[in-house]
Amino acid sequence: MGFITKAIPLALAAASVINGAEIMETRAGVQTLADKYIVVMNDGMTDKDFDSHRSWVNRTHRRRLIRRGAKAMGGMKHTYRFPTGLKGYSGHFDEQMINEISKRADVKYIERDARVQINAIEQQDNVPSWGLARVGSKEPGGTTYYYDGTAGEGSTAYVIDTGTDIQHEEFEGRATWGANFVDDMDMDCNGHGTHVSGTIGGKTFGVAKKSNVVAVKVLDCNGSGSNSGVIMGMEWATKDAQQKGADKAVANMSLGGAFSQASNDAAAAIAKGGVFLAVAAGNDNVDAADSSPASEPSICTVAASTEQDSKADFSNFGQVVDVYAPGDSITSAKPGGGSQVLSGTSMATPHVAGLGAYLIGLGKGGGPGLCDTIKQTAIDVIQNPGASTTSKLINNGSGIGFLSFPLNIYEEQWSKLFDL
């Protein structure tokens, strides 16, 4: 499947408390990173107090290394300062140091850092995608995508993923490189991120064909990274969006894993910062309530549907799911040119992020409230959606009377796009 799985610690279910700071324990089988942690500070901490805490950590860590005379731990690596107030850091600390940190009254909780990786990918070359046609039609089985000519113009989509091939012809110069928190190669050497980006803003495969795409790389060529690196990407996207206009921005996270309070808090900080965030529900065919950041209520959680308007057999479900979107055998861009077919809630999610960008182009305004707008325009068609799960499938509103402003409808037929 195309969903990116984060092997993240299970928080809250089992946590030790040392002087008020929880050290989150991990679920059996989770691939944690040895001696690496994420530390989240108390709500409302000032920048001055945060800097003072960080200075204390660095001083204490250095003293411990000198006394130990052992192989050096790396110490503090990433620092998080979300514009909405969430603060924290990650680093490489021994058990004694992390216990010292946990005793601090200004620490809210600590999680073990964990590996992030992608699942197996289904691939088939050079076939047309049905997903776009479904987004623009009230009925299944169509071959034409109906959309307003604004096509997301003026919006920006932050794709937090494996990177994007920004030179791909699908993006017509509208894709740019944003930041890299995993390696020194500003390229998508995996393919997942380019596929996701193409579904959002590609000229052929995109829901919002005139939107801008910003690549935020948090996973390497093998589709692997760390939870701490993903949170850095989330922070960077939030800050950049606020500088350029959060009400014109959307973010896509086609990744997730076991429940993580740090991951959920970072996702909530994006939404609080005024950015619409679409997140994959997951590919384990289980209730997404135990997944992160899918279980964060302030974001838009997306399950995957099939061409027959049924729940994809791999898709997670549950009350936390906001909408369904096409996610089975979706065609989009691949690095180096051309296209490929992938399946997963990873593929469903950019349809929703793209629809958010599309609605921004129509003047509906941005922010987390876009999820409610998307649910209002959705159609009640999904068969067997799963226990306590919505049956709403996204729709762009073209020709079905949901949107309260005039549309200049364009149409694209797959026979034209693919010379069939």
Curated annotation (Swiss-Prot):
One family name in Pfam for this protein: Peptidase_S8
InterPro entries: PCSK9_ProteinaseK-like, Peptidase_S8/S53_dom, Peptidase_S8/S53_dom_sf, Peptidase_S8_His-AS, Peptidase_S8_Ser-AS, Peptidase_S8_subtilisin-like, Peptidase_S8_subtilisin-rel, S8pro/Inhibitor_I9
Assigned EC number: 3.4.21.-
Top-level enzyme category: hydrolase
Domain Inhibitor I9 intervals: 36-118
Keywords, alphabetical: Glycoprotein, Hydrolase, Protease, Secreted, Serine protease, Signal, Virulence, Zymogen
Keyword Membrane assigned: no
Residues excised as propeptide: 21-119
GO cellular component: extracellular region
Classification via SUPFAM superfamilies: Protease propeptides/inhibitors, Subtilisin-like
Coiled coil residues, start to end: none
Role of this protein: Secreted subtilisin-like serine protease with keratinolytic activity that contributes to pathogenicity.
Name by which UniProt lists this protein: Subtilisin-like protease 7
Gene name per UniProt: SUB7
